[in-house]
Amino acid sequence: MNIMRTAMLLAFMTALFMGVGYLVGGGSGMVIALLMASGLNFFSYWNSDKIVLRMYGAREVDRHSSPVYYKIVSDLAKKASLPQPKVYVIDNAQPNAFATGRNPQNAAVAASTGLLERLSAEEVAGVMAHELAHIEHRDTLTMTLTATIAGAISMLGNFAFFMGGQRSSSEDSHGAGAIGGFIALLVAPFAAMLVQMAISRTREYAADRRGAEICGNPLWLASALRKIADGGHGVYNEEAEHNPATAHLFIINPLSGEGADSLFSTHPATANRIAALYRQAEEMKGALAESGGWNEEGGMNKKSNDEMNYGDFRGGQAYVPGEQENSTFQRVTKRPSWLRYDNSKKSRS
């Protein structure tokens, strides 16, 4: 399904380029546009993930620089039977995250410092499980290509206007090129919106559900979405505002003023996603009650900050945060075994 969706997306982009090329340059313009589209599609397939990561200044981290964050991603990938993705941190106060890559073997996940600072380890696990679900569903290729292609489409108006102006100077065109350029200038933004809408919003619901299955508790992701939504739109994300074509990559729309569910939204309404996760938690209520994640009132158990300590990450050892993890991860007790460091035996010997 995603292979067909990707093929349709690339075909649409090629047709769009050729149509604009023909509009402003006739047959020769269409040929030039075809060559340009083919080159862009080829380049985007191999490099769009690198472009997006570089666009947001993402820096790769490992088990030494960010041991807790890296371990969460690593353990979740094992639980989902996925290859270990590359792990990145984005220096941005807005809590958010995304996944990218052309396939599971060449995938990466990125979380902002704002997300790591605001969320508990359980909530971070819920977010990362959601992103790994996108990788498992192979959404990441389509999502990343869409971001690159939609950005390119936004440039078509200027390209068409310039080419139209050149063509209008010929006697045969009699000003038709300028008119064609103006039409293309109007059509290009709408076409960019259509490309973004080519990625169905239902993929977010599917990734939420599968992510909850991977991490084992829908309430972790529900709590994370609420925190991200509450804190996200109040923090200006300069990179996202300058590159709105990438908004659909994130777990929650990073653009200011977004959040309501509508026909042209890149994401479902956060409240609807949380409601779906609570319904999923009801389905899993028995298993969650045994793990201590669900109380008798049908909500997530809360723990006081006084009970929280990093020792739970390492079987009782005092945990020293990595360079990228100072002041991150609210401390939470009673973590499942996979969410802890498992070298406690060594520490007691």
Swiss-Prot record:
E.C. designation(s): 3.4.24.-
Q: Which GO terms describe its biological process?
A: proteolysis
What molecular function does GO assign, one term? zinc ion binding
Instruction: Provide the alphabetized UniProt keywords.
Output: Cell inner membrane, Cell membrane, Hydrolase, Membrane, Metal-binding, Metalloprotease, Protease, Transmembrane, Transmembrane helix, Zinc
**Chief location of this protein?**
membrane
Q: Report membrane topology.
A: Multi-pass membrane protein
Q: Name one GO cellular component term.
A: plasma membrane
- Domain of life, per UniProt, equals Bacteria
Bound how, and how many: what does the cofactor note say?
Binds 1 zinc ion per subunit.
The residues that cross the membrane are: 7-24, 29-46, 145-165, 175-195
Give compartment(s): Cell inner membrane
Looking up InterPro entries in the UniProt record yields:
HtpX_protease, Pept_M48_protease_HtpX, Peptidase_M48
Q: Which EC class is the enzyme in?
A: hydrolase
Region described as Disordered: spans on this chain: 288-349
* Active-site feature positions: 131
Q: Which HAMAP family match?
A: Pept_M48_protease_HtpX
Q: Could you say which protein family the record assigns here?
A: Belongs to the peptidase M48B family.
Annotated protein name in UniProt: Protease HtpX homolog
The organism named in the record is Bartonella tribocorum (strain CIP 105476 / IBS 506)
